């Protein structure tokens, strides 16, 4: 697997994703980049909408989280290298705290109907 730092702002579709918070307080996406067919780790997240599962990172990249949260071995490999390069010692998976519907394939914004077939009345917000 190749390892590289992206030099430009990208549009990233991330599958099998999670959100990690470092001991520095920064949050990063970890997962599988559908367009590049590679494991991917984001620079620190600057803005994030958990309802639409879209975000902007410090590099200017736009992320769209696709499907359910999960684990990707390529993403984990990149995370191990990136976290060492960035001096991250301790981290926590904060996915369930930031994305209440992380187990659902569709974000709340796209999920018009709940499992019972009635309109979904759920709403969410973050700080």
Across the structure, where does each feature detected by a protein language model lie?
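Cysteine-centric segments in proteins
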Residues: 1-54, 61-127
């Amino acid at each position: 697997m190749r390892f590289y730092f992206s030099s430009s702002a990208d549009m990233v579709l991330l599958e099998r994703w999670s959100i990690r918070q470092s001991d520095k307080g920064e949050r990063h996406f970890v997962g599988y980049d559908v367009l590049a067919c590679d494991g991917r780790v984001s620079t620190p997240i600057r803005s994030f909408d958990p309802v639409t599962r879209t975000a902007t990172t410090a590099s200017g990249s736009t992320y769209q989280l696709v499907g359910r949260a999960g684990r990707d071995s390529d993403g984990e490999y990149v995370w191990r290298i990136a976290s060492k390069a960035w001096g991250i010692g301790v981290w926590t998976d904060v996915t369930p705290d930031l994305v209440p519907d992380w187990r659902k394939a569709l974000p709340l914004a796209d999920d018009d109907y709940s499992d019972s077939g009635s309109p979904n009345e759920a709403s969410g917000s973050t700080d």
